[in-house]
Amino acid sequence: YRRHFGPTYYAFDMGHTHYIVLDDIIYHGAKKYEEQIDSMQLRWAAAYARRLPAGSRVCVAMHAPAMKSWLGNRVMESAVPLMEAFAGHDLHFITGHTHLNSNFDIREGVIEHNVAQICGNLWWDPINWDGTPKGYQLFRECGGEFSWEYRNLGEFPARQIRLWGPGEVAKHPACAVAKVWNWDPHWTVVWY
């Protein structure tokens, strides 16, 4: 890849948003790897951050998530100096790897969009393991506003929820379960 295309980290601007792509998989061979950002990329990203006007919107795209909600909201060690470098900016992480779809506030001014797989659960199941259908995340910038929407393949964009009745979800047999693909902590949920 590097020989033909160049570094595995780079940046570009689209509209008023600055996008940074980082390689946060350090491969050791024999299917062994670490989920971290190496020091060379961290230095490069910090230098890039210093050139941006205060309050800029920045999206950092990388494979593994910056925060692992299933491990008590543990933040990737190398993501901490990255967030510090972009302090004072509107920072969004766009990540994958987990086969689920979620949006988390990591800290003030930092949101992570962990996007489910477009292939579902590794091609053999059209639903990711958290109930999100196979699809993709659409990020939009319009009039200075930034928004995101999950698009499930083969269904209308307005469909953003799947419901299971009591007895259909083994982990919660007495409950009705709702999976809203793109819920985030800023939504207001109203039960009727």
Model-found features: residue ranges?
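Short, compositionally biased P/S/T/A/G/V-rich stretches that sit at domain boundaries
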Residues: 142-174
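Extended active-site neighborhood of metal-dependent phosphoesterases/phosphodiesterases
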Residues: 1-54, 73-94, 100-142, 146-149
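Short beta-strand/turn micro-motifs composed of small residues
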Residues: 23, 62, 180
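Short acidic, glycine-rich surface-loop motifs adjacent to enzyme active sites
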Residues: 49-70
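Active-site glycine-centered loops adjacent to acidic/histidine catalytic or metal-binding residues
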Residues: 63, 96-97
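Short beta-strand elements bearing conserved aromatic residues within extracellular beta-rich modules
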Residues: 188-191
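Short edge beta-strand/loop segments characteristic of extracellular beta-sandwich folds
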Residues: 174-183
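Alpha-helix capping/helix-boundary segments
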Residues: 66, 99-100
